[in-house]
Amino acid sequence: MALQQIVEPIVTGLGYALVEIERSAGGLLRVTIDLPWPAPNGAAAEPAPDGALALEPAPSGAGTLDTAPDGATALETVPSGATALETAPNGAVSTPAQSVTLEDCEKVTRQLQFALEVDGVQYQRLEVASPGIDRPLRGEQDLLRFAGSVIDITLKAPIGGAAAGKVGATRKKFRGTLERTASGGWQIVWSDAPPPKPGQRVGKKRLPAPLQALGFSLDEVRDMRLAPIVDFKGRTGKAGAAPAG
């Protein structure tokens, strides 16, 4: 049985949403969970219409639980700044991040350990975590949930002829604001203007670079995540939050 078929029913059956399953070096099996998100009134979670990429001017205007069979326990910091706790499969602890709590991770870990053992899944450590600041976006429900956020998107193939001379035809990576189109599809809107350097004064007469928009379908996307935007002046911005001003 595929790993997804084992893990997802356990996670959803406990009242959570499965975000991602990853296998890493050293036998680490990482399962990322989140609280389910109800679609707002009138926002049906349906696949966006298929369509070719189109580039055009835009209109103006984590708690982590890490378990190991050897019974060792170690507290460490994960890359996203959340806290990870390693324990044996027969005991589990976790810490809260975003809306998923330590108790949530503990509950899922206990059930997964049993299910993985029954199905003979090989792993050295099991880590149950909430999404970090670069949360992956997998489907239409995620797009509806994070519409208006700044995201990083990587296409499966270069933009090619859709670039229309406005960006490099070989470009595959974009960062911008996720928006719904009038036709019900999805687009990312951005400006290629370089940000001002620290201490640089921007003249009032300086015209802003025009916004551009790239329409896409999920089939054309290799990877899509919330942009990990951090304010180094001492305040950490919300993941994927659109810059103010």
Curated annotation (Swiss-Prot):
Family matches, as SUPFAM superfamilies: YhbC-like, N-terminal domain
Residue ranges of the TM segments: none
GO cellular component, as recorded: cytosol
Disulfide bridge partners, by residue number: none
Compartments reported by the entry: Cytoplasm
GO biological process terms on file: ribosomal small subunit assembly; translation
UniProtKB keywords: Cytoplasm, Ribosome biogenesis
Protein origin, superkingdom: Bacteria
Function: Required for maturation of 30S ribosomal subunits.
Family as reported in the entry's similarity comment: Belongs to the RimP family.
The protein's name: Ribosome maturation factor RimP
